[in-house]
Regions:
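Generic start-of-chain signal for non-secretory N-termini
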Residues: 1-26, 42
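Acidic, mature catalytic/reactive cores of soluble proteins
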Residues: 2-4, 9, 45, 182, ...
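Alpha-amylase-like alpha-glycosidases and glucanotransferases acting on alpha-linked glucans and related
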Residues: 6-13, 20, 64-211, 236-407
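Active-site-adjacent substrate/metal-binding segments within catalytic domains
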Residues: 17-19, 30-32, 54, 111
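Short, acidic/polar
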Residues: 32-43, 290-300
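Catalytic domains of carbohydrate-active enzymes, especially glycoside hydrolases
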Residues: 35-60, 304-305
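Conserved, mostly hydrophobic/aromatic
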Residues: 44, 54, 162, 221, ...
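Conserved, well-ordered alpha-helix/loop/beta-strand core segments that scaffold catalytic motifs
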Residues: 203, 207-236
Length: 407
């Protein structure tokens, strides 16, 4: 792989493990950013490995998929370390008396979300209790870090209002809200912020906890010579803060409904293709804004990781646009995307070689390969695919190109 972001290190080989934090061992239903994560980093170091790859770390929405987050920026509150909150005296042992008996084989996310959300809200109430004099209340450095996070995270206000708005509407998607919040004017937005101020504070608090814990963990890994490989989906969920707050950047009608949605055409694996349903980008508008939203997204993600895998890389070259309302992906069409222009702008803005891994699996044509190679981005090789048609198979190790990542 190419050199790390912002460093002058020569390219070297990286070897590691792909393991999402939720799969780490721990006592609270799923893995967290606590002791289990630190032990895993120690294990990587002892094993002579230098890379930890994770799935997208976003705040998951419907279906609990990391590839359908509520936000391109917000982190997953379910992996906040509850033991860390004990250390901050925001939670106590007696708060865990009614903890469910977790199934070691399968996660009941409904039960998990109810349990952890209750504890996070309890921690938030204590965070604002000035009568407490221990833990975080006796740590000016932690309080300053919280204030700095809230001041510098330009995405945080919209995220907090969006999530508080969803709670206010019992989880209803934003495109079914009343007009003064679905497409609010500046004044209407200010009114809702005042109305939902306390609820918004909770979401800012949990995002600070996630960011603080994850960046502390990342520093621990980096200090031991372990690089973090992050991951993001190319498209955003329809019911996400990014679509709600930036409707002109997506192909939506006047009511907030997509005119076309994402997917892939029919192929060897599916006679009807794949209908993902994500709203597609209005690339003309992104180009007019200098790709500001995308640049902010990539820049922020690179504070959380050293390399970044982007799912469905081919969508930067051409994307499959399916008319909204179709039941399959058959009636879509390929539409050009501004791949070269976009990555040129991204590279110029970052000021160094892009530390991006291109997920280039599936039906890939020459123009996708040219885009990938023009910017020196490593593609992916999957050994599991190596033994179909072994005479001519790019996934066999002796056929690998030099700049690639093998799984």
């Amino acid at each position: 792989m190419a050199e790390e972001a912002g460093t002058s290190k020569k390219p070297k080989k990286y070897t590691g493990i792909l393991l999402h934090p939720t799969s780490l061992p721990g006592p609270y239903g799923i893995g967290e950013l606590g002791a289990g994560a630190y032990r895993f980093i120690d294990f990587l170091e002892r094993s002579g490995l230098n890379t930890w790859q994770v799935l997208p770390l976003g705040h998951t929405g419907f279906g609990d998929s990391p590839y359908q987050p509520f936000s391109a920026f917000a982190g997953q509150p379910l992996i906040i370390s509850l033991d860390h909150l004990k250390e901050l005296h925001l939670l106590y042992d007696e708060d865990f008396r009614d903890m469910p008996a977790w199934n070691a084989e399968q996660i009941n996310y409904g039960e998990l979300i109810e349990f952890k959300t209750g504890l996070l809200k309890l921690a938030y109430s204590r965070f604002h209790d000035e009568s407490l004099s221990d833990g975080i209340h006796d740590d000016p450095e932690m309080k300053q870090a919280y204030d700095n996070f809230c001041e510098t995270s330009v995405w945080l206000e919209d995220y907090a209002l969006f999530m508080a708005g969803k709670d206010y509407h019992q989880g209803m998607p934003w495109y079914m809200w009343e007009d003064n919040l679905k497409k609010p004017t500046k004044k209407q937005k200010e009114t809702w912020v005042k109305k939902l101020d306390t609820e918004m504070g909770y979401y800012k608090f949990i995002q600070f906890l996630f960011y603080y814990e994850w960046t502390t963990l990342k520093k621990y890994a980096n200090d031991k010579g372990i690089s973090i490989v992050g991951d993001i989906p190319i498209f955003m969920a329809w019911d996400s803060v990014d679509v709600w707050a930036n409707q002109s950047l997506f192909q939506l009608d006047s009511k907030g409904y997509p005119t076309v949605v994402a997917g892939v055409p029919p192929d060897y694996f599916s006679a009807t293709g794949q209908l993902w349903g994500n709203p597609l980008y209005n690339w003309k508008k992104h180009t007019e804004t200098g790709y500001e939203w995308w640049l902010n997204r990539i820049r922020y993600q690179l504070t959380l990781c050293d390399f970044l895998r982007i799912d469905h890389f081919r969508g930067f070259d051409k994307y499959w646009a399916i008319p909204y309302g179709e039941e399959t992906a058959i009636n879509g069409k390929w539409v050009e995307a501004p791949g070269v222009n976009f990555f040129t702008q991204l590279e110029a803005t970052l000021g160094y070689h892009l530390p991006i891994i291109a997920e280039d699996l599936g039906e890939i044509d020459d123009s996708v390969i040219e885009l990938r190679d023009k910017f020196g981005l490593p593609g992916m090789k999957v050994l599991q695919f190596a033994f179909e048609n072994p005479e001519e198979n790019d996934f066999l190790p002796h056929n690998f190109v030099r700049n690639c990542v093998c799984y």
